[in-house]
Amino acid sequence: MVSPVTQPSRHSGLGIESVVPPALPGLSPTSESTKPMSASPIADRWIVLKFGGTSVSRRHRWNTIGQLAKKRADETGGRVLVVVSALSGVTNELTAIADGAADSRERVAALVTRHNEFLAELELGAEVLAERLAALQALLDDPRAASRPLDWQAEVLGQGELLSSSVGAAYLRSNGLDFGWMDAREWLDALPPAPNQTEWSQRLSVNCQWQGGGDFKQRFSAQPTRMLISQGFIARHGDGGTAILGRGGSDTSAAYFGALLGASRVEIWTDVPGMFSANPKDVPDARLLTRLDYYEAQEIATTGA
């Protein structure tokens, strides 16, 4: 299969070339970028793995993520960064809340229940997410909530990835894996506004700096654990607040990290074996497209497939 997700079209400077690594049970790679391994010390060599919402919403999926991350670290002798999306469907709920849905409190309550139930499935205590869920609830009582300014909306939208990554880090550590957690907003910076860029896109559909110097990699690699987990979708705005990369931005986050770290690979993983002619969850007879080049995939995406 030729991967359809070779590089985000609006970030063509990242220069990603696609190959396909072997699949693991329950998850399949949709793309992998490769560049020659640098001569840097092993502690500074990175592989980036990205997992979407359905891939982080069940316990057995997290088991696979942990196994894959450890395998990549062991086989390369390097380090691994895992980038995750929010649990499946959570961003849709947060979008409704950010848009001012009349039943926002009920939606937040449902999200709290769902995440606590997931903690129970993982045999983790409620304290793992106590502060994060309290922060989500507090956003409804924030004075900004009445007028819903863009900076408040960005904070709401980014909660899903902060929650899922916190759950994942706690679970993987409970399984004895050397995982640390990091806030993507401390490492990915939104670019200054472009000419004629709308205020909305300056906050909720940003591009990020992807050309980092040796200082970035040195500081990043100083984090003590062999493997790290972070969030897709979010970055730091120029005012220090939260910025959003836009829907589907978690894949782009992984590409940014890969470029900044000079990673040897960036792998985008999913729970389906490739690109289909239609959504297989909605169309039972959807066909797996066994061969598809980047431009064909781009055309299909443009038509809303």
For each of these PLM feature ranges, what is it?
Residues V2-S3, E17-L27, E32-A305:
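Nucleotide/pyrophosphate-binding catalytic subdomain
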